[in-house]
């Protein structure tokens, strides 16, 4: 059997479940754990590769904690060893620089809904010659690789969304990073027992993921919602599961902190005044929840 190498807990369930499926077909899958900052070590991939390894799949940027992976380094390693390299770029596309040739990417997948495009449409880039077997058999659409009538309206909507996102990318991402860093600084300096999950610099422009000790993240989300603030206690795919985030577990975060975690995402429309409002609400809400927390009172 062949080996498919990637970091287990941090990958999106779209990748995790696919790997579980091929394992049942007899393929050997190696799962690699990231470092505490959420970044996979190239040395760990190098150690995990077997003589029969044929595919490495690594998420370009994580949807929960925003960490950006060393895609170019992994791509170069894969190319040297004649291993196919796939990256899940759903979060990264239009938010960071991606060059499939320079990064030696063989396959790249992404989705329109992450850049204000329509839901239900995405694309899979495949370097010519990498894959010869059709995914879906039928009428031979998409050069015979994926049969079925194309979603023309979705394709056009995706193209327009991508065009718009790429046109203002430099200005937009720089602004988002300034606002992101401003909010991170305020939260970490003004709210005791708070921590930022993921790397402080190598992260998506608009992503922030905080854990607030002695606070229930779900309750905090409800309080923020009543104040007009949209936030998340995890990925949209696992909302309501009642399970701690597999991403946070992969970086060694204890379950009690996983359940005390809130994710914020900002875009170019968010103002400094709005961030100040969010941080002030956070401070008040967290103080209120900690007053009611027996663990916090015992800790004091």
Regions found by a protein language model. Give the residues of each.
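Short, small-residue-biased leader/transition segments that mark boundaries at the very start
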Residues: 1-6
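Active-site phosphate-binding strand-loop segment of PLP-dependent enzymes
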Residues: 30, 34-94
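Conserved active-site segment immediately N-terminal to the catalytic lysine
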Residues: 87, 93, 99-116, 133-135
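Conserved core segment of the aminotransferase class I/II
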Residues: 119-173
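Structural signature of PLP-dependent enzymes
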Residues: 162-185, 195-204
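Conserved C-terminal alpha-helix-loop-beta "cap" of PLP-dependent enzymes
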Residues: 208-263
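PLP-dependent enzyme catalytic core of the Aspartate aminotransferase-like
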Residues: 243-300
């Amino acid at each position: 059997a062949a080996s498919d190498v990637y970091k287990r807990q941090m990958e999106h369930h779209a990748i995790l479940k696919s790997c579980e499926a091929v394992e049942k077909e007899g393929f050997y899958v190696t799962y690699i754990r990231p470092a505490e900052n959420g970044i996979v070590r190239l040395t760990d991939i190098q150690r995990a590769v077997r003589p029969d390894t044929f595919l490495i799949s690594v998420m370009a940027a994580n949807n929960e904690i925003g960490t950006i992976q060393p895609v170019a380094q992994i791509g170069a390693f894969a190319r040297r060893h004649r291993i196919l390299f796939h990256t899940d770029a759903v979060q990264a596309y239009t938010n960071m620089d991606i060059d499939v040739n320079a990064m030696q990417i063989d396959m790249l997948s992404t989705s329109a809904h992450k850049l204000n495009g329509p839901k239900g449409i995405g694309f899979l880039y495949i370097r010519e010659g990498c894959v010869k077997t059709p995914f879906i058999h039928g009428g031979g659409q998409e050069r015979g690789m994926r049969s079925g009538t194309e979603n023309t309206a979705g394709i056009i909507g995706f193209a327009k969304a991508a065009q718009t996102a790429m046109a203002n990318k430099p200005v937009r991402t720089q602004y988002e990073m300034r606002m992101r860093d401003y909010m991170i600084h305020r939260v970490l300096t003004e709210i005791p027992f708070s921590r930022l999950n993921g790397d402080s610099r190598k992260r998506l422009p608009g992503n922030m993921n905080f854990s607030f000790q002695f606070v229930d993240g779900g309750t905090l989300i409800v309080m923020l919602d009543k104040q007009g603030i949209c936030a998340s206690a995890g990925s949209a795919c696992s909302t309501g599961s009642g399970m701690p985030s597999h991403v946070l577990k992969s970086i060694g975060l204890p379950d009690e902190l996983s359940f005390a975690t809130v994710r914020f995402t900002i875009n170019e429309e968010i103002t400094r005044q709005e961030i100040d409002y969010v941080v002030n609400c956070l401070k008040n809400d967290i103080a209120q929840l900690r007053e009611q927390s027996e663990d916090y009172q015992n800790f004091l």
